[in-house]
Amino acid sequence: MKNTGTLKVTLPTEREIVMTRVFDAPRRLVFDALTKPELFKRWFGPRGWSLVVCEIDLKVGGAWRSVLRGPGGKEMGMRGVYQEIVPPERLVSTEKFDDYPGESLNTLVLVEQGGKTTLTITVLYESQGIRDAVIKSGMEHGAAECYDKLAEMLAPENK
């Protein structure tokens, strides 16, 4: 695959996308930014988009829902259910977009070393066709922008 800025995207199997990004922050702060609505709202979504719905019920079996609104009012909604939660190191949830077929299983792992945190998210799709359609959509650019915004929020001068 390719690197988009500091986001590394790989395709290790026919049905997976793996994204990796290093943040200059302890994993507890990264975990909080992923799971607390008041923080999640500050960084999630590509530049020019706003998060108009942010619901996080952080428990196994709990649901999450996000709706992004882009330029011109276009909305993109997604939702899922938490399958596993191990603070501050692991989150597993389903993910389904309102306007796209299929559901994925997202496994997010945070590893801290030397005050920096490596985020690795493995997205497992129902089929190679769905995975390939996601890649062709340019998803990695939107994800890279989101993680750039998260890095900015986590920067020591912004804490």
Spans of model-derived segments:
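Hydrophobic ligand-binding cavity/cleft-lining segments
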Residues: M1-S50
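Short, surface-exposed charged micro-motifs
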Residues: K8, E55, V81, T107-V109
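Glycine-rich portal/gate segments that line the openings of hydrophobic small-molecule binding cavities
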Residues: L51-T94
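Short, highly charged C-terminal tails/helix-capping segments
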Residues: A155-K159
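Beta-strand/loop substructures that line and gate deep hydrophobic ligand-binding cavities in soluble
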Residues: V92-E145
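Intrinsic-disorder/low-complexity, polar/charged segments enriched in Ser/Thr/Lys/Arg/Asp/Glu/Gln
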Residues: E14-T20, R27, L51, A63, ...
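A short, structured loop/turn motif at beta-sheet edges
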Residues: R27-R28, L58-K59, Q83-E89, V109-T118
